[in-house]
Amino acid sequence: MSVKGMAIVLTVILCAAIVQGFPMFKGGRCLCIGPGVKAVKVADIEKVSIIYPTNNCDKTEVIITLKTHKGQRCLNPKAKQAKAIIKKVQRKNSEKYKNI
């Protein structure tokens, strides 16, 4: 293989290695699309999942699973209800790990 051919192959390999490190889309793969709802009836909440920022998604997501097969809703993490839920979960987790 000629020097010119080797240079082209090396350039392609380097470009592929560099491109592989970049995210495909800004923000990655967040589960919530858009800001989410501001509030949900407390009586309808079955489960709360809080997903903190990661390499895949740069925002905090609050996902509420509703009772009676009504599905899931994303709660706006800046909303008053979401802030209260996050605070409660953090307090519960800190008490849980405090006893270890």
UniProtKB/Swiss-Prot annotation:
Which residue stretches, if any, does this entry annotate as coiled coil? none
CDD domains attached to this UniProt entry: Chemokine_CXC (cd00273)
Specify the domain of life of the species encoding this protein: Eukaryota
Could you list this entry's UniProt keywords, alphabetically sorted: Chemotaxis, Cytokine, Disulfide bond, Inflammatory response, Secreted, Signal
Gene Ontology molecular function, alphabetical: chemokine activity; CXCR3 chemokine receptor binding; heparin binding
Cystine residue pairs:
30-57, 32-74
| BP GO terms, sorted | adenylate cyclase-activating G protein-coupled receptor signaling pathway; chemokine-mediated signaling pathway; chemotaxis; immune response; inflammatory response; positive regulation of release of sequestered calcium ion into cytosol; regulation of cell population proliferation; T cell chemotaxis
User: Which compartment or compartments is the protein found in?
Assistant: Secreted
Described function: Chemotactic for interleukin-activated T-cells but not unstimulated T-cells, neutrophils or monocytes. Induces calcium release in activated T-cells. Binds to CXCR3. May play an important role in CNS diseases which involve T-cell recruitment. May play a role in skin immune responses.
Q: Write out the similarity annotation.
A: Belongs to the intercrine alpha (chemokine CxC) family.
User: What's the protein here called?
Assistant: C-X-C motif chemokine 11
Gene name per UniProt: CXCL11
